[in-house]
A protein has these predicted regions:
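RNase H-like two-metal-ion nuclease catalytic core shared by retroviral integrases
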Residues: 90-91, 102-103, 123-145, 161
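Active-site-proximal acidic segments at structured loop/helix or strand boundaries
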Residues: 141-210
Length: 210
């Protein structure tokens, strides 16, 4: 990823691109797809984080969409992108939101509050039942299922599966999407400039119960 960003910086054109999404912000969600890992059939749950300005994405898979998977997915995504988004848009998943208060604000779960405090990003939420509020990541959830997991993935381990998914995310950086003249990777340069620096250590992705 670092090599690609360096090359994209060198090639970046001076041109005006109408911006639908501000750079430096993200959306996150989970999807599901069938996979065979070490000979065992699973309904894999895959974490997706997107940067809607550039359409850059990160995808990694888990046996279940647990709290630990949410936390680990953030750690991996931030490392992949090389920084922390200014804000991340979510749905109201129970691993993240303990409850929605009367004023519409969210009471975070203890684990998610720890993650947010460690990385210092703003957490934002879509309206309950309104998946189109985070349409960018919803689109990539479907794209990843069709393009990264068809035919049904078969790998010796979850680590091998996730290496494959990361390679696919890197390859996608070369794509030029409809309505754009720059590749995803070229647009990602603007996102990267507005990401905040990673802390010295990643967050401990273990859900500690009181």
């Amino acid at each position: 990823m670092k090599d690609y960003v360096f090359a994209a910086r060198q090639r970046q054109r001076e041109m005006f691109v109408p911006l639908t999404h501000p750079a430096g912000h993200a959306q996150a969600d989970f999807g599901e797809a069938d996979a065979v890992i070490a000979g065992v059939e699973y309904r894999a749950h895959y974490f997706v984080m997107t940067l809607p300005h550039s359409d850059s994405c990160f995808v990694c898979a888990y046996p279940a969409a647990t709290t630990e998977a949410w936390l680990d997915g953030h750690n991996r995504a931030f490392n992949f992108f090389g920084g922390v988004p200014q804000s991340i848009l979510y749905d109201n998943d129970k691993c993240l939101v303990a409850r929605i208060l009367r004023d519409g604000s969210r009471q975070r779960t203890r684990a998610f509050s720890g993650l947010q405090s460690h990385y210092l990003f703003e957490d934002r939420y879509g309206r309950p039942g309104k998946g189109n509020d985070k349409g960018n990541v919803e689109g990539v959830v479907g794209y990843a299922r069709r393009n990264f997991m068809t035919p049904r993935p078969r790998f010796a381990s979850w680590d091998a599966f996730n290496r494959h998914l990361e390679e696919q995310c890197c390859k996608r950086q070369r794509d030029v999407l409809r309505g754009h003249r720059e590749s995803i990777g070229e647009r990602f340069v603007r996102d990267l400039e507005l990401l905040t620096a990673l802390p010295p250590t990643p967050f401990d992705a273990c859900d500690k119960q009181a």
